[in-house]
């Protein structure tokens, strides 16, 4: 076990490179199971969840080769198992993404019910119901989803909830199904589009990704390709908020500003000077930010994965801001930890009312999930004294070398053993 120690007070200044998006890398790695030939995935972030996914594929017998620059070549010719065991799936909800590809290409799958962040109800019934509609025989027992199918059939599926992993799983399954599948109320996130681009490069026929209706014409086989993962929009937003909170000036490279327009808008509203080009964005903040109101929503709305970071920004801003969470329940646990640092936050159901204070005071805090841990690091960057963030295995699931990148920008931060 490790922790982060942060001495606040240093404005962040300089340039850093943004990593590939975890939430794009994981479904694309699952999609490699669909291809007959080897697939190479580029711009893979070096993260715990990616390592877990590679271990999961390796347990199935898939051959993986890691090249320079975190390019991963995946060859499924040696696959001999179609089981995703509990000891791997329990740490990462995205493991369920292998369910659709395994059923579609190999006709069988046994996937443990998933784990991951403790941020409310994320039921798997949408995955199961959709695959059943495509003809799969599925039972859930002994903690596993067990499925069989001769060949999946195209179906018209309306998802009760717009879910990213549900959309991705069913889209991958439909890619090799017989006939046409229509997904209604589909997630519109950029990571869904990135996955559709990968499937189409393999020879698939996916249309409408990025809209609420996706149509997939199934094909008999898919081929291996070289696919590059898109930049991490949440990492981009996190470092921009960090710079705004510390009164700094940063330039982020190898990113995609068009994917974070809602975040950039709120940062400008807070008083930051923001500029962007094709693959870069800069931010400069003079003095304290102004508090902002925001409400999370599925893409292209304000991302729930940036909510905690803006709670931290509001905590040291001038004025009062209200943050409303509409995507997940139970996602204000970071606010309780920030209160221990002196933040003035009132939780009212799905709403956090935050009155900015002039300073936060360092304290030992505990990370409860991935984005909560990031917000506590941001709070530590501006707190007086030394902040200790425990349980940072959460942050390692979604941020590549966070202490190294922050230190590169001038933060006083170090990783130490417990």
Swiss-Prot record:
Gene3D superfamilies in alphabetical order: Enolpyruvate transferase domain (3.65.10.10)
InterPro entries reported in the protein's UniProt record: Enolpyruvate_Tfrase_dom, Enolpyruvate_Tfrase_sf, MurA_subfamily, RNA3'P_cycl/enolpyr_Trfase_a/b, UDP_GlcNAc_COvinyl_MurA
Lineage of the species this protein comes from: Bacteria, Pseudomonadati, Pseudomonadota, Gammaproteobacteria, Chromatiales
Keyword ATP-binding listed: no
Keyword Cell division: yes
One Pfam family here: EPSP_synthase
GO cellular component term, pick one: cytoplasm
Chain residues that bind UDP-N-acetyl-alpha-D-glucosamine: 93, 305, 327
Similarity comment text for this entry: Belongs to the EPSP synthase family. MurA subfamily.
Keyword set, alphabetical order: Cell cycle, Cell division, Cell shape, Cell wall biogenesis/degradation, Cytoplasm, Peptidoglycan synthesis, Pyruvate, Transferase
UniProt cross-references to CDD domains, sorted A to Z: UdpNAET (cd01555)
Organism expressing this protein natively: Halorhodospira halophila (strain DSM 244 / SL1) (Ectothiorhodospira halophila (strain DSM 244 / SL1))
First-level EC class: transferase
Residues annotated as catalytic: 117 (proton donor)
Function: Cell wall formation. Adds enolpyruvyl to UDP-N-acetylglucosamine.
Designated name of the protein: UDP-N-acetylglucosamine 1-carboxyvinyltransferase
Pathway noted in the entry: Cell wall biogenesis; peptidoglycan biosynthesis
BP GO terms, sorted: cell division; cell wall organization; peptidoglycan biosynthetic process; regulation of cell shape; UDP-N-acetylgalactosamine biosynthetic process
Location(s), subcellular: Cytoplasm
Gene: murA
Residue numbers carrying 2-(S-cysteinyl)pyruvic acid O-phosphothioketal: 117
UniProt GO molecular function: UDP-N-acetylglucosamine 1-carboxyvinyltransferase activity
Catalysis: reaction(s): phosphoenolpyruvate + UDP-N-acetyl-alpha-D-glucosamine = UDP-N-acetyl-3-O-(1-carboxyvinyl)-alpha-D-glucosamine + phosphate
EC number assigned by the record: 2.5.1.7
Positions contributing to phosphoenolpyruvate binding: 22-23
């Amino acid at each position: 076990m490790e922790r982060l120690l942060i001495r606040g007070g240093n404005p962040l200044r300089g340039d850093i490179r943004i990593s590939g998006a975890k939430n794009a890398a994981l479904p694309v790695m699952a999609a490699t199971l669909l291809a007959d030939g080897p697939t190479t995935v580029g711009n893979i972030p070096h993260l715990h969840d990616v390592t877990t996914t590679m271990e999961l594929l390796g347990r199935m017998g898939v051959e993986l080769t890691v090249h320079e620059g975190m390019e991963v070549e995946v060859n499924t010719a040696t696959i001999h198992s179609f089981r995703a065991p509990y000891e791997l799936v329990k740490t990462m909800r995205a493991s369920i993404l292998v369910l659709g590809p395994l059923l579609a290409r190999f006709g069988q799958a046994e996937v443990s019910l998933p784990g991951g962040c403790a941020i409310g109800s994320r039921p798997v019934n949408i995955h199961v119901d959709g695959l059943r509609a495509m003809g799969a025989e599925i039972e859930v027992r002994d903690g596993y989803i067990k499925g069989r199918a001769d060949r999946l059939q195209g179906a018209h599926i309306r998802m009760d909830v717009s879910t990213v992993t549900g959309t991705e799983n069913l889209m991958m399954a439909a890619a090799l199904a017989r006939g046409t599948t229509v997904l209604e109320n589909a997630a519109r996130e950029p990571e869904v589009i990135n996955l559709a681009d990968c499937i189409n490069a393999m020879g698939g026929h996916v249309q409408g990704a990025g809209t609420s209706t996706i149509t997939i014409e199934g094909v008999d086989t898919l081929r291996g390709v070289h696919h590059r993962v898109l930049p991490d929009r949440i990492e981009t937003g996190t470092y921009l908020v960090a710079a705004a909170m510390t009164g700094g000036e940063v330039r982020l490279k190898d990113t995609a500003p068009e994917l974070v327009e809602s975040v950039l808008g709120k940062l400008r509203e807070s008083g930051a000077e923001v500029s962007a080009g094709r693959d870069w964005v800069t931010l400069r903040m003079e003095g304290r930010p102004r508090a902002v109101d925001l409400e999370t929503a599925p893409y292209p709305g304000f991302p729930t994965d940036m909510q905690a970071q803006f709670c931290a920004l509001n905590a040291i801003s001038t004025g009062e801001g209200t943050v409303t969470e509409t995507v997940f329940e139970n996602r204000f646990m970071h606010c309780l930890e920030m209160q221990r640092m002196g933040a003035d936050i009132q939780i009212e159901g799905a709403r956090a009312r935050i009155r900015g204070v002039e300073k936060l005071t360092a304290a030992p805090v505990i990370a409860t999930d991935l984005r909560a841990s990031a917000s506590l690091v941001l709070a530590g960057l501006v707190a007086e004294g030394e902040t200790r963030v425990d349980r940072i295995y959460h942050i390692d699931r979604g941020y590549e070398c966070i202490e190294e990148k922050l230190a590169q920008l001038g933060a006083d931060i170090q990783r130490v053993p417990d």
